[in-house]
Amino acid sequence: MQIYLANPRGFCAGVDRAIAIVNEALARFEPPIYVRHEVVHNKFVVSDLANRGAVFVEELHEVPDGSIVIFSAHGVSKAVEDEAERRDLTVFDATCPLVTKVHIEVAKFAREKMDAVLIGHQGHPEVEGTMGRFSAQYGGEIHLVENEADVEKLEVSDPDRLAFVTQTTLSMDDTAVVIDALRKKFPNIQGPRKDDICYATQNRQDAVKDLAQRCEVVLVVGSPNSSNSNRLRELAERMNCKAYLIDNAGEMKKEWFAGVGAVGVTAGASAPEILIQEVLNQLQQWGGDLPDELKGIEENVTFSLPKELRIPVKEVGL
């Protein structure tokens, strides 16, 4: 059985930065360090950080006054940010800079008294944070749509003063369909100057398409609550591959590969390489060949840590 390995795969710059922020905070300051929401959507990563003193909470009321809290890579609403300031919490913001870019766009549209449309999945923390960056005090409104049916039902106050943004981890193909529907219904709708789908999401989706053309089965290493990992699985399935989303090698079943000539392995943007290697090892134990790593786009994007975590502790004033 041939094994093909997607490239790029796994950690993106935003995830690297978010995990580094938690690690640096734990190294500089004594636990507990509170983290609002899972810093990234991966069970292995979250469990490892929790074992070293990170305390994961869903809401700020679970964080004692005066504590250190880290916002997850998915971003938070303005209301959450304001609450942290009121309660004298020391905040290290691990929001991915590409998500922050969308926050800035939404806030700008609000100030310009426009309505905004967010293409995204209801209930996802990134969507909640972005929706919460739109201030209705200027008279506009933000609307959430997931698909063409939502666009068909959408009503806005002024179709000529309308703009859209997207969640960063969506399927490019699905998003293009929704954008086309928006432009058809609202010909004067404005879009972002640059596509909101992040570079890592796009690169990993391109890589899984390459993988699916060569394989009968595709394994996506990632947690069930990872949006970008789910999109990779769906994309492989659309290309007539059997595709499985797995947290780790222990979730694989040998019967998945009975009679299979080629299997592909990729990983979502929040899955660490160690989990990918464990999957490859298990496949080889079941008779797979040495993995063939496919060529792909080389990623050299990096994001710096907050300045408070780059200077000596005594200068931070904590």
Curated annotation (Swiss-Prot):
<feature type="binding site">
    <location>
        <position position="12"/>
    </location>
    <ligand>
        <name>[4Fe-4S] cluster</name>
    </ligand>
</feature>
<dbReference type="Pfam" id="PF02401">
    <property type="entry name" value="LYTB"/>
</dbReference>
<feature type="binding site">
    <location>
        <position position="74"/>
    </location>
    <ligand>
        <name>isopentenyl diphosphate</name>
    </ligand>
</feature>
<dbReference type="GO" id="GO:0046872">
    <property type="term" value="F:metal ion binding"/>
</dbReference>
<comment type="similarity">
    <text>Belongs to the IspH family.</text>
</comment>
<feature type="binding site">
    <location>
        <position position="226"/>
    </location>
    <ligand>
        <name>dimethylallyl diphosphate</name>
    </ligand>
</feature>
<feature type="binding site">
    <location>
        <position position="226"/>
    </location>
    <ligand>
        <name>(2E)-4-hydroxy-3-methylbut-2-enyl diphosphate</name>
    </ligand>
</feature>
<feature type="binding site">
    <location>
        <position position="124"/>
    </location>
    <ligand>
        <name>(2E)-4-hydroxy-3-methylbut-2-enyl diphosphate</name>
    </ligand>
</feature>
<protein>
    <recommendedName>
        <fullName>4-hydroxy-3-methylbut-2-enyl diphosphate reductase</fullName>
        <ecNumber>1.17.7.4</ecNumber>
    </recommendedName>
</protein>
<comment type="function">
    <text>Catalyzes the conversion of 1-hydroxy-2-methyl-2-(E)-butenyl 4-diphosphate (HMBPP) into a mixture of isopentenyl diphosphate (IPP) and dimethylallyl diphosphate (DMAPP). Acts in the terminal step of the DOXP/MEP pathway for isoprenoid precursor biosynthesis.</text>
</comment>
<keyword id="KW-0004">4Fe-4S</keyword>
<feature type="active site" description="Proton donor">
    <location>
        <position position="126"/>
    </location>
</feature>
<feature type="binding site">
    <location>
        <position position="168"/>
    </location>
    <ligand>
        <name>(2E)-4-hydroxy-3-methylbut-2-enyl diphosphate</name>
    </ligand>
</feature>
<keyword id="KW-0414">Isoprene biosynthesis</keyword>
<comment type="pathway">
    <text>Isoprenoid biosynthesis; isopentenyl diphosphate biosynthesis via DXP pathway; isopentenyl diphosphate from 1-deoxy-D-xylulose 5-phosphate: step 6/6.</text>
</comment>
<feature type="binding site">
    <location>
        <position position="270"/>
    </location>
    <ligand>
        <name>(2E)-4-hydroxy-3-methylbut-2-enyl diphosphate</name>
    </ligand>
</feature>
<feature type="binding site">
    <location>
        <position position="96"/>
    </location>
    <ligand>
        <name>[4Fe-4S] cluster</name>
    </ligand>
</feature>
<feature type="binding site">
    <location>
        <position position="228"/>
    </location>
    <ligand>
        <name>(2E)-4-hydroxy-3-methylbut-2-enyl diphosphate</name>
    </ligand>
</feature>
<dbReference type="InterPro" id="IPR003451">
    <property type="entry name" value="LytB/IspH"/>
</dbReference>
<dbReference type="GO" id="GO:0016114">
    <property type="term" value="P:terpenoid biosynthetic process"/>
</dbReference>
<feature type="binding site">
    <location>
        <position position="227"/>
    </location>
    <ligand>
        <name>isopentenyl diphosphate</name>
    </ligand>
</feature>
<feature type="binding site">
    <location>
        <position position="41"/>
    </location>
    <ligand>
        <name>(2E)-4-hydroxy-3-methylbut-2-enyl diphosphate</name>
    </ligand>
</feature>
<feature type="binding site">
    <location>
        <position position="270"/>
    </location>
    <ligand>
        <name>dimethylallyl diphosphate</name>
    </ligand>
</feature>
<feature type="binding site">
    <location>
        <position position="198"/>
    </location>
    <ligand>
        <name>[4Fe-4S] cluster</name>
    </ligand>
</feature>
<dbReference type="GO" id="GO:0019288">
    <property type="term" value="P:isopentenyl diphosphate biosynthetic process, methylerythritol 4-phosphate pathway"/>
</dbReference>
<feature type="binding site">
    <location>
        <position position="227"/>
    </location>
    <ligand>
        <name>dimethylallyl diphosphate</name>
    </ligand>
</feature>
<comment type="pathway">
    <text>Isoprenoid biosynthesis; dimethylallyl diphosphate biosynthesis; dimethylallyl diphosphate from (2E)-4-hydroxy-3-methylbutenyl diphosphate: step 1/1.</text>
</comment>
<feature type="binding site">
    <location>
        <position position="227"/>
    </location>
    <ligand>
        <name>(2E)-4-hydroxy-3-methylbut-2-enyl diphosphate</name>
    </ligand>
</feature>
<feature type="binding site">
    <location>
        <position position="124"/>
    </location>
    <ligand>
        <name>dimethylallyl diphosphate</name>
    </ligand>
</feature>
<feature type="binding site">
    <location>
        <position position="74"/>
    </location>
    <ligand>
        <name>(2E)-4-hydroxy-3-methylbut-2-enyl diphosphate</name>
    </ligand>
</feature>
<dbReference type="GO" id="GO:0050992">
    <property type="term" value="P:dimethylallyl diphosphate biosynthetic process"/>
</dbReference>
<dbReference type="GO" id="GO:0051539">
    <property type="term" value="F:4 iron, 4 sulfur cluster binding"/>
</dbReference>
<keyword id="KW-0408">Iron</keyword>
<feature type="binding site">
    <location>
        <position position="228"/>
    </location>
    <ligand>
        <name>isopentenyl diphosphate</name>
    </ligand>
</feature>
<feature type="binding site">
    <location>
        <position position="41"/>
    </location>
    <ligand>
        <name>dimethylallyl diphosphate</name>
    </ligand>
</feature>
<keyword id="KW-0560">Oxidoreductase</keyword>
<feature type="binding site">
    <location>
        <position position="74"/>
    </location>
    <ligand>
        <name>dimethylallyl diphosphate</name>
    </ligand>
</feature>
<feature type="binding site">
    <location>
        <position position="124"/>
    </location>
    <ligand>
        <name>isopentenyl diphosphate</name>
    </ligand>
</feature>
<feature type="binding site">
    <location>
        <position position="226"/>
    </location>
    <ligand>
        <name>isopentenyl diphosphate</name>
    </ligand>
</feature>
<keyword id="KW-0411">Iron-sulfur</keyword>
<feature type="binding site">
    <location>
        <position position="41"/>
    </location>
    <ligand>
        <name>isopentenyl diphosphate</name>
    </ligand>
</feature>
<keyword id="KW-0479">Metal-binding</keyword>
